[in-house]
Amino acid sequence: MSLDIVILAAGQGTRMRSALPKVLHPVAGNSMLGHVIHSARQLSPNGIHVVIGHGADAVREQLAADDLNFVMQDKQLGTGHAVAQALPALTAETVLILYGDVPLIEVETLTRLLKLVNPQQLGLLTVTLDDPTGYGRIVRDQQNRVCAIVEHKDANDVQKAITEGNTGILAVPAKRLADWLGRLSNNNAQGEYYLTDVIAMAVNDGLIVATEQPYGAMEVQGANDRKQLSELERHYQLREARRLMAGGVTLRDPARFDVRGEVSVGRDVLIDINVILEGKVVIEDNVVIGPNCVIKDSTLRKGVIVKANSHIEGAILGEGSDAGPFARLRPGSVLGAKAHVGNFVELKNANLGEGAKVGHLTYLGDAEVGARTNIGAGTITCNYDGANKHKTTLGTDVFIGSNNSLVAPVDIFDGATTAAGSTITQNVPTEQLGVARARQRNIEGWKRPVKIRKD
């Protein structure tokens, strides 16, 4: 079965009280529309057609991709009118209609819905709610067959008592859709062309309206204001927390843990409170992450320990290595197996060999550090001359004394040592001691200044 997907994303979202288009408001680090597009892609459709209107330029700019066809709805005249704008681009046998502000819809739910569709049957996703206020009501006949959907504003008291609501998510035979959309009327309380009226037309044309339900109501919850947006955020985070715990991860407090990207986590991993995982993060078995850490676009190999208050971005931490507390690893940083980065250490585009140690209060930028090398406290690489970046290379078994400035480009070869307080501007040969500091003088008879009294 070939498939086209239409995503309705033209709404203004006035209740958000924001200049940002509603569908671009983020849930878990990705826009609501971005979540929907991600789910749509997993269905392998012929095309994904995004109907845009308010803030169209911003939507295009943020989400532009080769597999997306943006369709403009100049006037917002209802959901039926919105789908009609995409009709000329539809070529598949089945059309699935989704909504850009319903970000938590599961691929499994959509797959079940699509299985209902055939030339004589369409699929409708409904949800049963204790309070369906605001939802269109699913009207069924005496044989429990769907015969119509009545919007909440147009419903009478009997219809408002119905607890089965319309989610708006619909899968239909494409050959029928153009005819039904062409017959829509705006004779209703809103003066709009409702997509829901397609259901009654399908029934009148002899088609069966088969229904499917999501695993939970939050899966089809939209966000019209900031409160609803926060509810979606919290539901998503708890869902991700449960998924990780089911896979063998210990979370000290699932309510104080955030995922904002694609995360792969191994078994026997311990994650403390207030940890944020952003972007693409891979965490292997037996990793420990302390409290208040941010891990972004990074890989943590087996047995890594990240201590409290560390920020790691674009880095690879080798097996058995550790970082923190208060460590910052910037993009391009690599820790070899069993390497150690201590408190208040910043790395940027630095590669530490196996067993290398950078204990504290250090900055290494654009540096290559060999195995088992030890770098003393207060050391910095002077890698930028105001115009260009330069590299510092330290061999294996090097010992850098405390409070060193390594002025790049410079090489310190295997087994070399630098004295504390040195400013190293020249290469240090293998197993030699580099000393670059002024000789100390002790001045006899020196008097400490005294404070001048002011009368």
From Swiss-Prot:
Cofactor mode of binding and number, as noted: Binds 1 Mg(2+) ion per subunit.
GO-annotated biological processes: cell morphogenesis; cell wall organization; lipid A biosynthetic process; peptidoglycan biosynthetic process; regulation of cell shape; UDP-N-acetylglucosamine biosynthetic process
Positions of region (Pyrophosphorylase): 1-226
Catalytic activity: alpha-D-glucosamine 1-phosphate + acetyl-CoA = N-acetyl-alpha-D-glucosamine 1-phosphate + CoA + H(+); N-acetyl-alpha-D-glucosamine 1-phosphate + UTP + H(+) = UDP-N-acetyl-alpha-D-glucosamine + diphosphate
Active-site residues annotated for this sequence: 360
GO cellular component terms attached to this protein's record: cytoplasm; membrane
Binding site for Mg(2+): 101, 224
Sequence positions that bind UDP-N-acetyl-alpha-D-glucosamine: 8-11, 22, 73, 78-79, 99-101, 136, 151, 166, 224, 330, 348, 363, 374
EC number: 2.7.7.23, 2.3.1.157
Keyword Repeat annotated: yes
Top-rank taxon, per record: Bacteria
Pfam families: Hexapep, NTP_transf_3
Subcellular location: Cytoplasm
Residues holding acetyl-CoA: 377, 383-384, 402, 420, 437
Region listing for N-acetyltransferase, in residue ranges: 248-455
Keywords from the named record: Acyltransferase, Cell shape, Cell wall biogenesis/degradation, Cytoplasm, Magnesium, Metal-binding, Multifunctional enzyme, Nucleotidyltransferase, Peptidoglycan synthesis, Repeat, Transferase
Location of region: Linker: 227-247
Pathway where it operates: Nucleotide-sugar biosynthesis; UDP-N-acetyl-alpha-D-glucosamine biosynthesis; N-acetyl-alpha-D-glucosamine 1-phosphate from alpha-D-glucosamine 6-phosphate (route II): step 2/2; Nucleotide-sugar biosynthesis; UDP-N-acetyl-alpha-D-glucosamine biosynthesis; UDP-N-acetyl-alpha-D-glucosamine from N-acetyl-alpha-D-glucosamine 1-phosphate: step 1/1; Bacterial outer membrane biogenesis; LPS lipid A biosynthesis
Cofactor requirements of the protein: Mg(2+)
Subunit structure: Homotrimer.
NCBIfam families with a match to the protein in the record: glmU
Main function: Catalyzes the last two sequential reactions in the de novo biosynthetic pathway for UDP-N-acetylglucosamine (UDP-GlcNAc). The C-terminal domain catalyzes the transfer of acetyl group from acetyl coenzyme A to glucosamine-1-phosphate (GlcN-1-P) to produce N-acetylglucosamine-1-phosphate (GlcNAc-1-P), which is converted into UDP-GlcNAc by the transfer of uridine 5-monophosphate (from uridine 5-triphosphate), a reaction catalyzed by the N-terminal domain.
Family: In the N-terminal section; belongs to the N-acetylglucosamine-1-phosphate uridyltransferase family. In the C-terminal section; belongs to the transferase hexapeptide repeat family.
PANTHER family per record: BIFUNCTIONAL PROTEIN GLMU (PTHR43584:SF3), NUCLEOTIDYL TRANSFERASE (PTHR43584)
Official protein name in the record: Bifunctional protein GlmU
Organism annotation: Pseudomonas savastanoi pv. phaseolicola (strain 1448A / Race 6) (Pseudomonas syringae pv. phaseolicola (strain 1448A / Race 6))
Gene it is expressed from: glmU
